[in-house]
């Protein structure tokens, strides 16, 4: 379900990117931003002797774009003229806000910048569909579309503000009452709405992909940690139970493995005397012939014979016990 929603969002983002760029390109390339009445279409029909046209005379209908004005009525019907944003008969203060506004209006920098950003954003959307694992491309596309929308709305605001000082030859009484916005203007406004929507969708896709990537990484980490040998170690209680059982088994083993021969031998001769007798033979190996004493040798042999006789008696008794013990 999530992949289906993401695929639908990606499809809407792609279609919206194409629509926003197309609308803005059509808007800046056509001359139907404004319908107004102007005297430019019949102004050349007058001579210097006739004087200026009547003050109350209404101008002919024109439609204009960002760079041209075209006549719908009058002598020059169907002809278009380049808009002169700085007429020679007007004296402008170069530090005034009106002069700066006319410069921005003449350059149309914001609509052009918006179109360029929309193009770059559309390319990023296409690259994001090809390289789906790179989320930064989709994020870059979202940022570009948001910036394009902001540039577009700034250009529209500047265009609306400059209508009071429209560069056509409208008279003062005609400036407020005889103009309407055309479909090119509305295409530009619609492009702003679509661009912002596409930007939000692109950022949302980036956030969802990033969340899914983090969840997948966390799940793989937990899976790897559960399969490690440290995760299979027994618990403290299990280790304690095993240690208790092993201690019990070690305590019970001597009683089962004890032999009567060993008990007889250890009970007959203390361990201290046995070690003493054993160590007493070592000096005989290192002594010289001059230190040989017959008395010491006779005592040693007597104790050695007693030890052998006692060992034989203990072994004989143990063998009798084994024979007489019923199975």
UniProtKB/Swiss-Prot annotation:
Residue spans of biased composition, Low complexity class: 246-256
Topological category with respect to the lipid bilayer: Multi-pass membrane protein
InterPro entries: CACNG_subunit, PMP22/EMP/MP20/Claudin, VDCC_g4su, VDCC_gsu
Coarse class of the protein's main subcellular location: membrane
Positions annotated with a glycan in the UniProt record: 42, 45
Gene Ontology CC: one annotated term: AMPA glutamate receptor complex
Keywords of the record: Calcium, Calcium channel, Calcium transport, Cell membrane, Glycoprotein, Ion channel, Ion transport, Membrane, Phosphoprotein, Transmembrane, Transmembrane helix, Transport, Voltage-gated channel
Transmembrane segments: 10-30, 108-128, 137-157, 187-207
Modified-residue entries (Phosphoserine), positions: 259
Spans within the Extracellular topological domain: 31-107, 158-186
Oligomer status and interactors: Interacts with CACNA1C. Identified in a complex with the L-type calcium channel subunits CACNA1C, CACNA2D1 and either CACNB1 or CACNB2. Acts as an auxiliary subunit for AMPA-selective glutamate receptors (AMPARs). Interacts with GRIA1.
Name of the protein this chain belongs to: Voltage-dependent calcium channel gamma-4 subunit
Organism: Mus musculus (Mouse)
Biological classification of the source: Eukaryota, Metazoa, Chordata, Craniata, Vertebrata
Gene: Cacng4
């Amino acid at each position: 379900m999530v992949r289906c929603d993401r695929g639908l969002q990606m499809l809407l983002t792609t279609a919206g990117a194409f629509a926003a760029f197309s609308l803005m390109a059509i808007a800046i390339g056509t001359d139907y931003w404004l319908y107004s009445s102007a005297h430019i279409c019949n102004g050349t029909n007058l001579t210097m002797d006739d004087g200026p046209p009547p003050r109350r005379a209404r101008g002919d209908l024109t439609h204009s774009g960002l760079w041209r004005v075209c006549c719908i009525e009058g002598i020059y019907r169907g002809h278009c003229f380049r808009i002169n944003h700085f007429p020679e008969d007007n004296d402008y203060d170069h530090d005034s806000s009106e002069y700066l506004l006319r410069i921005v209006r003449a350059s149309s920098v914001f609509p052009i910048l918006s179109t360029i950003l929309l193009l770059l954003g559309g390319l990023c959307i296409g690259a994001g569909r090809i390289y789906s694992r790179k989320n930064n491309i989709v994020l870059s596309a979202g940022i570009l579309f948001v910036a394009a929308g902001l540039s577009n709305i700034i250009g529209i605001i500047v265009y609306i503000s400059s209508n009071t000082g429209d560069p056509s030859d409208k008279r003062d009484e005609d400036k407020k009452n005889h103009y309407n916005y055309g479909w090119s203007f509305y295409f530009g406004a619609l492009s702003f709405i679509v661009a912002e929507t596409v930007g939000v969708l692109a950022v949302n896709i980036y956030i969802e992909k990033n969340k899914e990537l983090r969840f997948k990484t966390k799940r793989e980490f937990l899976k790897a940690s559960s399969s490690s040998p440290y995760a299979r170690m027994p618990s403290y209680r299990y280790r304690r139970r095993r240690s208790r059982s092993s201690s019990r088994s070690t305590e019970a083993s001597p009683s089962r493995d004890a032999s009567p021969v060993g008990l007889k031998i250890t009970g007959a001769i203390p361990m201290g005397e046995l070690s003493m007798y054993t160590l007493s033979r070592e000096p005989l190996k290192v002594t010289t012939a001059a230190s040989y004493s017959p008395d010491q040798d006779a005592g040693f042999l007597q104790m050695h014979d007693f030890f052998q006789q006692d060992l034989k008696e203990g072994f004989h008794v143990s063998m009798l016990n084994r024979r007489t013990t019923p199975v």
